[in-house]
Amino acid sequence: MFAKRNETIGIFNTIPQGWTEISEAEYITLRNTPSVEVQREFKLKELKDRVNRLKVNNSEMYITSSLGFKVNADTNSLENVNTLIDLNANIFRDFDNKIHKVSLDDLKTIKSEIQQNTVNLYQQKWKYEEIIKKASISELKELKLNFEMLDFKQG
């Protein structure tokens, strides 16, 4: 007879106490399912890949600046803002491709907000890592890796 208890499966002559009888088909499916440790590694890799995709030129990686418009917040955008600061530029193109006249202080504000959002992204990643390290197989399957970007808008 085939049986399972929590995430453990086995074959028995009689079903031990605390175990539940399962069909041979379910046993085969469960036997071929990677262990919780392997599935945690898969989920951690998925998390790492998701964060890396967000950091590099990604349309999901934007913030609402305290200056009142959306700003791309990936690593390429941070580099672009640094260049604008170095050149003392007074024009900035936002997430929606609108042009804004800005001061050096405005650019420094944008830079700081992008940096704060990057820290926020990593803090969320670290929380997910802790969740994944403790999750069961069913919890791993249900876990969605969604990230919230910061909103610096006043009011």
Tell where the protein language model's regions lie, with residue ranges:
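A preference for well-ordered globular domain cores
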Residues: 2-155
